Amino acid sequence: MTMKLPIYLDYSATTPVDPRVAEKMIPYLCEHFGNPASRSHSFGWVADAAVEEAREQVAALVNADPKEIVWTSGATESNNLAIKGAANFYASTKGKHIITVKTEHKAILDTVREMERQGFEATYLDVKEDGLLDLEVFKAAIRPDTVLASVMFVNNEVGVIQPIAELGEICREKGIIFHVDAAQATGKVDIDLSKLKVDLMSFCAHKTYGPKGIGALYVRRKPRIRLEAQMHGGGHERGFRSGTLPTHQIVGMGECFRLAKEEMAEENKRVGALRDKLLKGLQDIEATFVNGDLTQRVAHNLNISFAYVEGESMIMAIKDLAVSSGSACTSASLEPSYVLRALGRDDELAHSSIRFSIGRFTTEEEIDYAIKLLHQKVGKLRELSPLWEMYKDGIDLSTVQWAAH
């Protein structure tokens, strides 16, 4: 089989729809087109049965009750519904203080900022240099009026896995609603909501080989969590989220979560071996740094800073590799990654970082090609860099006084 270029190594931005998922979706576009809310004929019943089967499949991956799964348009909407919905519902009884983390996805940070505009107070926690949250720092941030805490399961840029079980225990003990953004976690880490003390959890399909435009929010029933709806209309999804359900998208999400449950253990082994091969192949390039803890991390992610190479010029030089610097949602801006800044990386190293994310359809041949290409291009770009020359001459660049410009 000949290798196709460019090589896709950006699975954390999105994944291709697995052909098995696409095949399952197609009948619900044409023949089974009924509205799942149509209760009076078989077109509606067939669609409704498919929606409920998918709800069971999503619940099964995370060991939840299907009744706790609410369909949304994606993880961004789930995050908005969870944070705005819970904070507003409980503000009068619990308080108006929210805790989150500086390395969260923009869908969390911007939602919390919006809550601040509405009169809530927020604490944005620092992480350690390895990207992980210190539990003591989290505990210290809790106030009597803390209503909600939101911490992501797996970071989208550096792939580190936060200590969700421990954080859940702390929140439950203090009576704080605990929300977790698990967009990057499904199919990568085991999630057991019968054990985790998590009240709200956001999911989407397109990071797990399903279609874009569909997600879900887990809303715990015992103890019961209440939310204020953010989307008003026909009262679908038990009033949490109005709007006609997109049966084909939902079927796709159900199927991709079903496959994830079946194949996750094997896939993580294979993907982890490819990631380790990539890391080993790049470690002998001088002045490279891995961003984020390597043990508490999903198998799919490798984020490396190549010192003295500008991230943007690097991406141009390796255009045969589809990779990103920073996350897809913010990589259009030339600002250095706020996640890497929060890990204590300086602007230069944050700017020279590349995120490689590997997935279901990545081959060993592609990884070999990537290693070879990176060795060539990093060398070439550094030859053009006056900073590299100074570094090689033993000059400590942090002591250089640059003229203002």
UniProtKB/Swiss-Prot annotation:
Reaction catalyzed: (sulfur carrier)-H + L-cysteine = (sulfur carrier)-SH + L-alanine
| Pathways involved | Cofactor biosynthesis; iron-sulfur cluster biosynthesis
Keywords (A to Z) from UniProt: 2Fe-2S, Cytoplasm, Iron, Iron-sulfur, Metal-binding, Pyridoxal phosphate, Transferase
Which GO cellular component terms, listed alphabetically, does the Swiss-Prot or TrEMBL entry include? L-cysteine desulfurase complex
A biological process from GO:
[2Fe-2S] cluster assembly
Tell me which Pfam families the record gives: Aminotran_5 (PF00266)
User: Chief subcellular site?
Assistant: cytoplasm
Binding sites annotated in the UniProt record for pyridoxal 5'-phosphate = 156
List the active site.
Answer: 329
Gene3D superfamilies linked: Aspartate Aminotransferase, domain 1, Type I PLP-dependent aspartate aminotransferase-like (Major domain)
Q: Spell out the SUPFAM superfamilies in the cross-references.
A: PLP-dependent transferases
Q: What is its EC number?
A: 2.8.1.7
- InterPro entries, per database record: Aminotrans_V_dom (IPR000192), Aminotrans_V_PyrdxlP_BS (IPR020578), Cys_deSase_IscS (IPR010240), Cysteine_dSase (IPR016454), PyrdxlP-dep_Trfase (IPR015424), PyrdxlP-dep_Trfase_major (IPR015421), PyrdxlP-dep_Trfase_small (IPR015422)
Record keyword Metal-binding present? yes
Location in the cell reads: Cytoplasm
Q: Which residues bind [2Fe-2S] cluster?
A: 329
The similarity comment for this entry is: Belongs to the class-V pyridoxal-phosphate-dependent aminotransferase family. NifS/IscS subfamily.
Q: Which HAMAP family match?
A: Cys_desulf_IscS (MF_00331)
Q: What is this protein called?
A: Cysteine desulfurase IscS
Source organism per UniProt = Dechloromonas aromatica (strain RCB)
